[in-house]
Amino acid sequence: MKPARVPQTVVAPDCWGDLPWGKLYRKALERQLNPWFTKMYGFHLLKIGNLSAEINCEACAVSHQVNVSAQGMPVQVQADPLHLPFADKSVDVCLLAHTLPWCTDPHRLLREADRVLIDDGWLVISGFNPISFMGLRKLVPVLRKTSPYNSRMFTLMRQLDWLSLLNFEVLHASRFHVLPWNKHGGKLLNAHIPALGCLQLIVARKRTIPLTLNPMKQSKNKPRIRQAVGATRQCRKPQA
């Protein structure tokens, strides 16, 4: 697997308003999230990163919502997302709204989210789609050092591979909002070519039972039936 860790640090935006069409992205993401928020229950919801903190989660039944980030506002717990100050299996829902694109070690961040999530806990991930108008603008040299084009845009399939290694069950994966400057992202284009959407969303749950059985382990654990040992009986004829 191609390593995702990078040495350089790119400063993440403090709010959605710092991004071109950022508020439109946030609204589009919230529209996609609301139907899923109604399915989530528990005691604690963890929002990791400044952009996650601004996501409206009123539709979620989890009342205790904590914003965690290294800096910025509104932050309730100031901490490094790669070293979350929470106990194992203590969080019901973990929201990573465009947190991975500006993370130096996405694998480590996902492992931290996996660590703090309870069994069957919810993990929500959003990011930018590299195969979109957003991805094309990233190819322009003048824009590469400005947000959001200085972020890392991971393909949907690559992120799904990461989650499968951590034994997450993906319930939903989509791309949407094809036109970044449009309020609704271009309804007609969203309906016919959603694969070119600028935004992508993954909703997954942490599972404890392996989703794919290992055939090698399965054959080892399978009880074996002993084969009958062949035997010959010698019968002596009675003497006359």
Swiss-Prot record:
The segment annotated Disordered runs over: 216-240
Q: Which GO terms describe its molecular function?
A: S-adenosylmethionine-dependent methyltransferase activity
Question: Which named protein is this?
Answer: Uncharacterized protein YafS
User: Which species is listed as the source?
Assistant: Escherichia coli (strain K12)
Show the taxonomic lineage. Bacteria, Pseudomonadati, Pseudomonadota, Gammaproteobacteria, Enterobacterales
